[in-house]
Swiss-Prot record:
InterPro entries: Huwentoxin-1, Huwentoxin_CS1. Disulfide bonds join C50-C65, C57-C70, C64-C77. Residues 22-48 form a propeptide. Pfam families: Toxin_12. The presence of a 'disulfide through disulfide knot' structurally defines this protein as a knottin. Its main location: secreted. This is Hainantoxin-III 12. Selective antagonist of neuronal tetrodotoxin (TTX)-sensitive voltage-gated sodium channels (IC(50)=1270 nM on Nav1.1/SCN1A, 270 nM on Nav1.2/SCN2A, 491 nM on Nav1.3/SCN3A and 232 nM on Nav1.7/SCN9A). This toxin suppress Nav1.7 current amplitude without significantly altering the activation, inactivation, and repriming kinetics. Short extreme depolarizations partially activate the toxin-bound channel, indicating voltage-dependent inhibition of this toxin. This toxin increases the deactivation of the Nav1.7 current after extreme depolarizations. Belongs to the neurotoxin 10 (Hwtx-1) family. 15 (Hntx-3) subfamily. It comes from Cyriopagopus hainanus. Monomer. Expressed by the venom gland.
Amino acid sequence: MKASMFLALAGLVLLFVVGYASGSEEKEFPRELLSKIFAVDDFKGEERGCKGFGDSCTPGKNECCPNYACSSKHKWCKVYLGK
């Protein structure tokens, strides 16, 4: 059952790609499609001034984002639960 669902989904994806390729008049279609699929630079978020969960930090400095605190034991930002 799972294999047939996977094959059906793969077939639909293949049909979509072939349909898009036939409508495209560009000769560089395969390269362009692959570059769009694997372009991760577009999804990088803006750099922030504070460090988020799991980022390394120096205890005593206020480097972590709000609601996070630098763990003196592990030296990374974790959720601050208060006292």
